[in-house]
UniProtKB/Swiss-Prot annotation:
The lineage of its organism: Bacteria, Bacillati, Actinomycetota, Actinomycetes, Kitasatosporales. The keyword Phosphoprotein applies. It comes from Streptomyces lincolnensis. This is Lincomycin biosynthesis protein LmbN. Residues 113-275 form the SIS domain. GO terms for molecular function: carbohydrate derivative binding. Residues 1-78 form the Carrier domain.
Length: 275
């Protein structure tokens, strides 16, 4: 029996009686509400009894949110997983997810960018953390790679590039409004907002609340919204006119893997308009 099969069997003993949910490797356990915090504590105890003590660094909930993630955690704490196997699995997942990318969604996103350029509008971008660097990189590439001599250039603006404005709005009004307020003068019906986010922001509004906030303003103004996300897309994916999603949810590799593929997506959006 594989470690994953053992984990699935263990989870079936922890799941509430009467729950007929079919558990798979990527079933969301805690973020979906399928299991609660008491079940998480019970899971920790069961893992330590069955396998080995869990180091503090492994106790982040993200490491236990899917059966596959739990199996990966068990492999690490029992030393079944080596650096080489981690890299090999990361590259394998990267190839599979790249092959599964939806070209139609990326084509639709590229068309919105063309429509914005044709109408003389501005393409705005934003993100948090690593996704902020992707948003900045995207704005630079979209402005430079698409230059055609004699033609009007694409107008781009990355909302997380102005550190002074970012800190001023955060300090004075709060983090949730930091992009909305900067985008306010630019969001017209001719504009497109491209937002990058690994999780897409929580639907409850607590995590990455600045992204759904600026997306809602864009929708109110008649601007288009392109969301480039991972996991299930979150609140940002729900608001998007075009949603480009990397449906991976197994930490600790999910976040870096999704961020890497987001760079591929942003390059595809830019190359679609390259001369």
């Amino acid at each position: 029996m594989s470690t994953l099969d053992e984990v699935l069997a263990l989870l079936r003993t922890i799941a509430p009686s009467g729950d007929e949910t079919e558990l798979t490797a990527d079933t969301l356990l805690f973020s979906s509400g399928l299991l609660d915090s008491l079940a998480l504590e019970e899971l920790h105890v069961a893992i330590e009894e069955r396998w080995a003590p869990i180091p503090p660094m492994e106790l982040a909930r993200a490491n236990f949110d899917t059966p596959a993630a739990i199996a990966a955690t068990v492999a690490r704490i029992t030393h079944e997983e080596t650096p080489v196997s981690v890299v090999r699995n990361l590259l394998s997942d990267s190839g599979r997810l790249t092959a599964d990318l939806a070209p139609d969604a990326m084509g639709a996103g590229a068309q919105l960018l063309f429509d914005t350029w044709h109408a003389g509008g501005t393409t705005l971008s934003c993100g948090n953390g690593g996704s902020a660097s992707t948003a900045s990189h995207f704005a630079a590439d979209l402005a430079k790679l698409t230059i055609v001599p004699g033609q009007r250039r694409m107008r781009t603006l990355c909302l997380n590039d102005n550190a002074s404005a970012f800190s001023a709005w955060t300090n004075d009004e709060g983090f949730p409004v930091v992009y909305r307020e900067q985008a306010e003068p630019w969001l017209e019906p001719t504009a497109t907002l491209v937002a990058f986010s690994v999780h897409g922001g929580s639907r409850g509004g607590e995590v990455s609340a600045n992204l759904p906030a600026v997306a809602r303003l864009a929708k109110e103004r008649g601007a288009a919204v392109v969301a480039v996300t991972g996991f299930d897309g979150g609140a940002l994916g729900d608001l998007a006119d075009v949603h480009i999603n990397i449906p991976h949810a197994t930490e600790p590799v999910a976040t870096p893997l999704i961020e890497s593929l987001h760079v591929l997506v942003h390059h595809a959006l830019c190359v679609a308009h390259a001369p």
